[in-house]
Amino acid sequence: MGRSRGNFQNFEDPTQRTRKKKNAANVENFESTSLVPGAEGGGKYNCDYCQKDITGKIRIKCAVCPDFDLCIECMSVGAEITPHKCDHPYRVMGNLTFPLICPDWSADDEMLLLEGLEIYGLGNWAEVAEHVGTKSKEQCLEHYRNIYLNSPFFPLPDMSHVAGKNRKELQAMAKGRIDDKKAEQNMKEEYPFSPPKVKVEDTQKESFVDRSFGGKKPVSTSVNNSLVELSNYNQKREEFDPEYDNDAEQLLAEMEFKENDTPEEHELKLRVLRIYSKRLDERKRRKEFIIERNLLYPNPFEKDLSQEEKVQCRRLDVFMRFHSKEEHDELLRNVVSEYRMVKRLKDLKEAQVAGCRSTAEAERYLGRKRKRENEEGMNRGKESGQFGQIAGEMGSRPPVQASSSYVNDLDLIGFTESQLLSESEKRLCSEVKLVPPVYLQMQQVMSHEIFKGNVTKKSDAYSLFKIDPTKVDRVYDMLVKKGIAQL
């Protein structure tokens, strides 16, 4: 596939494997980048046999003899000069600096990309980028995905829109690049103080993040960092560890295209590549969905919600894939608003059953109820904390039965009407779970109906209240004890 093994007869020159390095002073670096003959700083090449100027032209470089070049004509007749022999392995040094498919990717870059993928395999984009030498890891990945994987002629690129130019246009482009380099060099000589250095990886990363996900991440806090750590998300690499469908690469681990493959085997391997491409697309879709919806960080909308309201929001997470971000946020607001209204209606109905006749009374009742629940929760916490300390003493002491007054008053704390009840009535309210205001209201209504003659037995009082008939029976029995009702 690559030029590094084209005509080498099992010989591999390590200096030619990755020849585009960051050191621009390397002569090998310029062998494929010099387009204009005699360009300044590019160096000239002469045929070592006929001494013809072959700068900027296709030439033959011997892989055994150091710094030995031949023109096409001398190579075709088998010219030899000691110590060079005509049977030495050689390399064709072409001029591939023109754009082929993309304006910012030369044909030389395309060949180095495919050669790097053949050597290091899919997924090792850092090594592939090092092999190309002029592109970053993100640029190599994006270019391979857009040009090769998403090509309608997969696995081949779409060659119907090749950015071809004639020789004059290519020379003009190269001359323009050389003029730009000269201008930059002059600027550096005039202004020796260089601007502040910016880490190239950071700038590339920021541009890649903005391009892929459409925005920067929110400012991280300690809570946010803990959520990111729990999700095993590496912010700097923008990867999960492990990734979704982490075993997808195992399909290609041992697969290799060979020259002796049958058409059926070749088609089968291409089908495996298509399946692998789809699995990568699904992995990318899920990752972009998580980043776009900001699922790695707490939702600001849920910051002021109660625990019950957060539970309601979590139940709707399964519908997030069917909505846009704005639609899902609107759904959460509507559901939370509905939950609050339903809860408010239940509280008001409970207050109404308790005998409240105004909003102020209902608020006082609900406030006392919440206060009582908080006190009971604190008491349970204290009792559980002290249980370990008094466990030994409990084993040595005889069991003490709690007083009936304490048990009866336990559920009646906070009701001023409880002062109007006797001990037996308090016990009745505790057993049947009736609050004092409701009990007094039932007693008043039943007494009024008994005096009018509408209630002569227990079953007659069932229609007066929309509660459990057993509670009505207990209240009626209490009126019988007081002599108001008759059996």
Swiss-Prot record:
Residues 401-487 form the SWIRM domain. InterPro entries: ADA2-like_ZZ (IPR041983), Ada2/TADA2 (IPR016827), Homeodomain-like_sf (IPR009057), Myb_dom (IPR017930), SANT/Myb (IPR001005), SANT_dom (IPR017884), SWIRM (IPR007526), TADA2A_B-like_dom (IPR055141). Residues 368-383 have a biased composition (Basic and acidic residues). PROSITE patterns: SANT (PS51293), SWIRM (PS50934), ZF_ZZ_1 (PS01357), ZF_ZZ_2 (PS50135). A zinc finger (ZZ-type) spans 42-98. Its main location: nucleus. Zn(2+) 1 binds at residues 47, 50, 71, 74. Residues 1-25, 368-388 are annotated as: Disordered. CDD domains: SANT, ZZ_ADA2. One of its GO terms (molecular function) is transcription coactivator activity. Interacts in vitro with the HAT domain of GCN5 and with the DNA-binding domain of the transcriptional activator DREB1B/CBF1. Interacts with BZIP11. The middle domain of ADA2b is sufficient for interaction with the HAT catalytic domain of GCN5. This is Transcriptional adapter ADA2b. It comes from Arabidopsis thaliana. The lineage of its organism: Eukaryota, Viridiplantae, Streptophyta, Embryophyta, Tracheophyta. The gene is ADA2B.
